[in-house]
Regions:
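Extracellular/periplasmic carbohydrate-active domains that bind, remodel
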Residues: 1-233
Length: 233
């Protein structure tokens, strides 16, 4: 699945959108697009979790795939109310902005849980990116938003080069992060800090980090504000 990134970027086109689906296998694919490669969707808005046209993504496996350039190799959202039991394994990434990207909308109740990522090699701007995403924000007058959550996320057995290893922003007003495990990782990065306070019960074991000097992706996308302005590092 191909859509050009340069010298002239193609239209915003995800390779695969998984929208309120269950029991999906993505295997032996090559993806290089000017947007997200695999995006988990399923609705947005202040009452999206109760709208009958929306739904969860459950029991999704991505394996034995290779990525060229993309904005996110595996992206949760931003239009996503619930994704659970997601496995990504045996993946090679040649380049891109974000490897694992969890977009969290301040105008949508969201839950991302039971995620396993393992046996990954490659390079991108951000290894793990969890930040607010407010593109096309519209609370529609609702003021009593439940707290969104990301729970039970495991990343293990990866060798990765990146600009930022742990691009994770705490925002307890809108979402709560809990029960993350980072195991057996070999990371080379410019920004090597890991904010342990951003995640409740963050377990880190056998993570080896080597600091590098050069930023390779100065134009990478981290988040987007309510004015639809792209924000990098």
């Amino acid at each position: 699945m191909l859509s050009p990134h340069e010298p002239v970027g193609g239209p915003s086109t995800d390779a695969i959108d998984i929208d309120a689906c269950s029991d999906v296998l993505v295997k032996n694919c090559y993806m290089a697009v000017n947007d997200d490669a695999v995006a988990l969707k399923g609705g947005k808005g202040p009452w999206a979790d109760t709208a009958p046209e929306n739904g969860p993504n459950e029991r999704i496996i991505l394996e034995d795939c290779e990525y060229g350039f993309c904005h996110g190799c595996l992206t949760f959202g931003s239009e996503n109310v619930h994704s659970s039991n997601i496995i990504m394994r045996n993946i090679k990434v040649s380049t891109g902005y974000n490897f694992l990207w969890l977009k969290l909308r301040p105008d949508t109740p969201q839950c991302y849980e039971h995620v396993l990522v393992e046996n990954i090699t490659g390079r991108a701007a951000n290894f793990l990116n969890i930040n607010p995403w407010a593109q096309f924000y519209d609370a529609k007058g609702r003021t009593d938003f439940p707290i969104s959550r990301c729970d039970d996320i495991t990343i293990r057995g990866c060798a990765f080069e990146c600009d930022t290893y742990f691009n994770v922003k705490a925002d307890e007003e809108h979402y709560h992060l809990s029960n993350f495990k980072l195991e057996d990782l070999d990371i080379k990065a410019v920004f090597t800090d890991c904010d342990r306070t951003a995640v409740e019960n963050l377990e880190i074991s056998d993570v080896r980090i080597v600091k590098k000097d050069t930023i390779d992706y100065p134009d990478s996308v981290t988040t987007m504000d309510a004015e639809n302005s792209v924000i990098g590092k």
